[in-house]
């Protein structure tokens, strides 16, 4: 008996010793973030690459800026590995990591199992682990969020102009609050915000042939929702031709010989996914699970690794276009850009953008033009292409103006261009005059609209499709105005933040100063109108809104970010702007049931506003202008406006970016 007790004590001692060793052993670390850990405070705030040179990095030395490192960085120049936090008690997470999502295989409706279903191979939606970027909109300090942003430069390779603007606003607010940069995550709709939840990887045994799985009545209902609510704003498909193939497929005769079965089934699944997502009355978790399951089927059926080896077809372009639209509402940025690039290149090879090769009929020619218009719209995900011919003409005109606005803000100077002596398309000091001309073009275009297309006469239109087209056109107009005047809004803060004394601020204002002030106000006025228009079209009692809810969230985010920027100066954050700000918050709260991202976006906005208005984080001079600390960068100072010549080189795009997807 004593021997057994001794043995038990010995085993217990060994167990305790092993437990102590495991407790002392370091937890598994994420890969070293060399770029982020070595970055100086200035480069960290601007979210740009830094070589970590000491005492001055190359970027700061080139621009003559003060270069400083935090004490923690100095103590650990090789970067600090972050330990994986202990898993908390299972609770609903704000936005789950894609790697941890378990997606059910069962369908949302009662199904009948097939005797020998077609089984998909493992076509992964995920990028390699080195580039994975789990998304969230919460704040640092939560155990779920400690490994969110491993490398923002890599994860936002296709960063939109609005996304960069939002990132700079939140970064500056964090700096003013005495927090490290990127304390507040600023995911942006149509860039990296998971509006549709986590798509995740398709199950290994996903059933692809679901003709008998999905009841015909339920499939008819989803298809009807798509034609009535999604197709008017995304006229990618030919309704008559698609319905003929759909009837043949469900009747048992199969798809026609000229139709690629896998591509058509992939398109049908994306149609179902969009039809499910647009239904605002379905609970969020159920809607995401069902829609993402359809999307996973579509991805597996398309077999993306085989697209490059297949001959191009109009059906393939249509499938890629719809897939791109769905991916825009996920955090699969690489897949989004890949789908867009493939669609555009295949359409170009098929000569969809010219009439050199005449199609067999006028209907085919019209369809090709619609598909090409959708390809053009891929450059800006909020560019919704309407269904009517009149709308199509006006939309193309507005798109042309928007293209020139973008060109006026693109950096056309780089090292190679300077070496070759190439002229710049737009000089930096010309943007004021160019903006006036472009604003006149927008006004002229707006005045050319017929009376029944004007915003004040919208209540007279009873046809839902016609109203949707008209509303979308006005959303695009307001967005273009915001985009046009946003650089002047940023420039205004740069000038005020650099004012050395109160006496300098009291000097008589010049014409340029007044122009900047007025353009900033016009930018905020457009954001106010955008907010009011969303409130006008949103009816919480409607199961499906006249505008898809993800577009409403996108425009609310645009308006909210600009209102946050207005809080930096009391002369711009007027009572009317303040009312519009609270209207944005109320509208986001009304959309919280649609996506976890919307819930945390509202909380992020409130937190950022509280930091701006907190007396501990700012000081106000005699003119009501927020004076930033000497060590803190202005809203868009060093990296965006280097001098009084209105340098846009670091603000919106670089030449390399223009080859990618450049959104507003």
From Swiss-Prot:
Matches recorded under CDD domains: fungal_TF_MHR, GAL4
GO molecular function: DNA-binding transcription factor activity, RNA polymerase II-specific; RNA polymerase II cis-regulatory region sequence-specific DNA binding; zinc ion binding
Signal peptide stretch: none
Main subcellular location: nucleus
Database matches in PROSITE patterns: ZN2_CY6_FUNGAL_1, ZN2_CY6_FUNGAL_2
Record InterPro entries: Fungal_SecMet_Regulators, Transcription_factor_dom_fun, Zn2-C6_fun-type_DNA-bd_sf, Zn2Cys6_DnaBD
Induction pattern: The promoter contains putative CRE1 binding motifs 5'-SYGGRG-3' and expression is differentially regulated in light and darkness by CRE1. Photoreceptors BLR1 and BLR2 negatively regulate the expression, while ENV1 exerts positive regulation.
Annotated S-S bridges: none
GO cellular component, one term: nucleus
Cellular localization per UniProt: Nucleus
GO BP annotations, alphabetical order: DNA-templated transcription; positive regulation of transcription from RNA polymerase II promoter by galactose
Stretches for region Disordered: 68-102
Reported consequences of knocking out the gene: Decreases the production of trichodimerol in light and darkness. Also impacts production of paracelsin in a light dependent manner, with increased paracelsin levels in light. Also results in increased cbh1 transcript levels and correspondingly increased specific cellulase activity.
Pfam families: Fungal_trans, Zn_clus
DNA-binding region: 40-67
Keywords: DNA-binding, Metal-binding, Nucleus, Transcription, Transcription regulation, Zinc
Record function comment: Transcription factor that acts in concert with sor4 which is a transcriptional activator of the gene cluster that mediates the biosynthesis of sorbicillinoids, a diverse group of yellow secondary metabolites that restrict growth of competing pathogenic fungi but not of bacteria. Regulates the cluster genes in a light dependent manner. Also plays a direct or indirect role in regulation of paracelsin biosynthesis and cellulase gene expression.
UniProt-recorded name of the protein: Sorbicillinoid biosynthetic cluster transcription factor sor3
Organism: Hypocrea jecorina (strain QM6a) (Trichoderma reesei)
